[in-house]
Amino acid sequence: MKVLAVTGYKPFELGIFKHDDKALFYIKKALENRMIALLEEGLEWVLISGQLGTELWAAEVAFSLQEEFPDLKVAVITPFLEQEKKWSEKNQEQYEAVLAASDFTESLTHRPYESPVQFKQKNRFFIEKADGLLILYDEEIEGSPVYMLNEAKKAQEKRDFPIYTITMDDLRVTVEECSFYEE
């Protein structure tokens, strides 16, 4: 696997409203654990659309892993221009920092938001270009990542397309493991 698309919940879908929420440590640790395993198998690119939450956190994790895995690259391909326009200043700063540190940035439609079709186009494009999907999602907790997941499941009908899921149970295990090692 060379290219991994990453998506998942937005912060509000997880009840996270602060950039220093303790839960972020565990979410990032779970993302890191999955990415390291894939890096050891040849992962080269992490592909995100720059959405708040899981995607930006995954980019931050990838940047931290670049010390150990210098060939790892991050691409941010947004569904439309100015997606951050209505975000808070703090969220815009995080987004701009990720864009600045990324190896490749582009907008899929080269236009501002027009309709939900742009999100559908982005989901199809990501699944078409990626070799697999890492998704922070739990079937029991509906949310925005379901659209990318459904697109990935369609791809699985036609080709080998692994979906690596981080569920709430996986996060609980991460918390327990981290707590065990802290003791």
Curated annotation (Swiss-Prot):
Q: Which SUPFAM superfamilies match?
A: MCP/YpsA-like
Q: Which domain of life is it from?
A: Bacteria
Q: Which InterPro entries match?
A: YspA
Name the NCBIfam families on file: PRK13660.1
Q: Which family does it belong to?
A: Belongs to the UPF0398 family.
Q: What is this protein called?
A: UPF0398 protein BLi02355/BL05236
- From which lineage does this chain's organism come? Bacteria, Bacillati, Bacillota, Bacilli, Bacillales
